[in-house]
Design a protein with these regions (language model features):
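Bacterial Sec-dependent N-terminal signal peptides
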Residues: 1-28
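Extended soluble regions of mature proteins
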Residues: 23-228
Length: 228
């Protein structure tokens, strides 16, 4: 149980990165983006991989974005408000539902503690889900453990949605919606590729805490499961 909850928190930290997009000076976007998730070079046991998501949905409306992952333990979502600068993580696991709210101060603290990153923009392009994307290489340097890694990003500049990745410590310099990108955490490389982009109206209810969720903090939730 404790390991399962720890995995949920790792995936929740993924969402703080995945749900936050910046859009260039194109047209405003409202709708849903679906991503296929693969694990290149993974040598994890099949039973462990069953705990990780195979797809992700991102809902975008005005200053809001919401990212949803279904895992072997349940559903994990992250809501981000770029105007008021807060995020809400929703955990629906093993019959229990929790909501964790992160303030501007908490978000800024996580940004300050994140490894530094540099972005190299390239001329190479690639068509993904019907959109021409530009390539960028993000180099992440972790001074604490003395490591350096490179992540590949393909992004489209056809949409406009200001400040949606305001608090993204890794991809904050990408000037467009990321339709293919990688993230490496604890040695696990995850690759996200947009499989569909649907322009449609999104209800504001998607970005609110459901009534049947218990509002708590990360510290309180960890204490409930033995500190992790």
């Amino acid at each position: 149980m404790k390991n399962a909850i720890k995995t949920i928190f790792i995936l929740s930290s993924f969402l703080l990165v995945f749900s936050l997009y910046s859009f260039a000076d194109g047209k405003p976007f409202e709708g849903e983006v679906t991503y296929e998730i693969t694990y290149p070079e993974s040598n994890l046991d099949a039973s462990v991989m069953e705990m990780f998501p195979k797809s992700m949905k991102v809902y975008i409306k005005d200053e809001f974005s919401k990212t949803v992952l279904n895992t072997g333990m349940g559903k994990t979502s992250n809501i981000f408000n770029s105007k008021e600068m807060y995020s809400i993580t929703l955990l629906d696991m093993m019959g229990q539902k929790y909501a964790l709210r992160s303030s501007t101060e908490i978000i800024n603290d996580k940004i300050e503690k994140a490894p530094s990153s540099q972005i190299e923009f390239l001329d190479e392009t690639k068509v993904i889900s019907g959109y021409t994307c530009k390539k960028a290489i993000v180099t992440i340097k972790d001074e604490l453990i003395k490591t350096e890694s490179e992540l590949i990003v393909y992004y489209s500049e056809e949409f406009s949605q200001k400040n949606l990745n305001k608090d993204n410590p890794i991809f904050h310099g990408i000037k467009g919606i990321m339709l293919e990108y990688e993230i490496d955490t604890q040695g696990i490389l995850m690759k996200f590729t947009a499989s569909s982009i649907e322009v449609k109206k999104i209800s504001k209810k998607e970005f609110k805490i459901p009534k049947n969720y218990e509002v708590t903090t990360e510290a309180e939730l960890k204490s409930k499961f033995g500190g992790m």
